[in-house]
Amino acid sequence: MKEVLIPSQMESLYQRLQNVGLPKSYVKRQGLPDWWCEEYEQSEGAIVTAAAHISKRFNLDLQSLLNGQDQPRFVLTSQPKYKLQNGTDPQSLSMSSAIAAKVAEIVASACKSPYEPIELSVAEIREEILDSWRFVTLKSLLDFCWSHGIPVVHFDQFPKATGIKKFQGMVACFHQRPVIVLSLKDSSPSRLLFIAAHELGHILRGHLSLTDASLLVDEEVKRESKDQEEVEANEVALELLLGRSDKSYSTERNYTAQYLADYAERVGFLDRVSPGVVALNYGWHKNHWGSANGALKLLEPNANAPRQINRRLLKNLNWDSLGNDYQEYLELALGLEQV
């Protein structure tokens, strides 16, 4: 007669997490402390310790992890406002939203600067930035946001699982402040600049409540969106970066990447528009992305926008206010040991 092997409590937990889209490898890498080992996993009480860490890091209900008959449940105290592409099921973004919301909550709790609501027009914000900078760039927009107590974080460490979608940008409100979360995995500062400006537009236009745990999630930021709030956020971003929301750098003929890069530097200097933004604007209006992407590579050599964003975050958090587990998790989830 064959012996029936009964899975351990930890293996059962891993399997239940796998069933909701959290692979064991991801859970062990992101959800458990660095001292965790196979030997400890076999000890009495390991399941309780593991569940406590995993629930805190991934925004999961603790009791649903401890009860072996339950399906693990993500915890969101308010229904996110999703801005979706046609055909996207909101449920497919629930996991990424919950995990990113926890990162935003941790960041908000440790932000050094108090939140100062922005009582300026878009034109006045642009003018304020240009008083200190030649262009509105990712770096200068980060300066502005942090000066008003609005953290900006880049987080893209989501599990890879069938049916689980990621998003490009989010505004999450915790501890009476908005937090901008960028999740597009892209090294270009100009691309992430537009998404950050778009998310700032949602804040300026009052598209979400500043009460705790409110979320606005942009699956994808597109210039051609017909959603009224997306149109308004795009208009804010365009006016902030270009000076006018209807400004176009389209040309009659198609440019090569090198010619576009030279053109972008020339007209960008005159118009006080970042050359990378000029190149993207050309690509949007001409639908000539080969040259636009090539120009960005020439204009932004060796760029690492996610690192730039999180390096700034590293300097603006009160790390002593966080417990050891949250410190370790942020460093791991945001790649801070590499910035």
List each model region and its residues.
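Active-site hotspot residues in diverse enzymes, especially metal/ion-binding acidic/histidine motifs
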Residues: 1-339
